[in-house]
UniProtKB/Swiss-Prot annotation:
GO molecular function list: DNA binding
Organism the protein comes from: Rhodopseudomonas palustris (strain BisB5)
Family stated for the protein in its record: Belongs to the UPF0335 family.
Cross-referenced Pfam families: GapR_DNA-bd (PF10073)
Protein name (Swiss-Prot/TrEMBL): UPF0335 protein RPD_1405
Amino acid sequence: MATSAAAVQDEPATRFAKDQLKAIIERIERLEEEKKTISDDIRDVYAEAKGNGYDVKALRTIVRMRKQDANERAEQETILETYMQALGML
């Protein structure tokens, strides 16, 4: 007894998988939209900071550094200082 493709699509397990897949895709799409909105908001904050006279590049560096582990940040600062001394920049 052969089952047709239409019969397989209507099986409860297949219906569940289709519904689950659709829900996952819709969640991803919603999160992507939220991510875009947040990115736009962050860009606006940097523009506001620039308008108030702050250096945006320095702000981005500080934000990136604050995300790092303190030990990792200290190690990178030590390496940077060593390189700068070797180049006569300090």
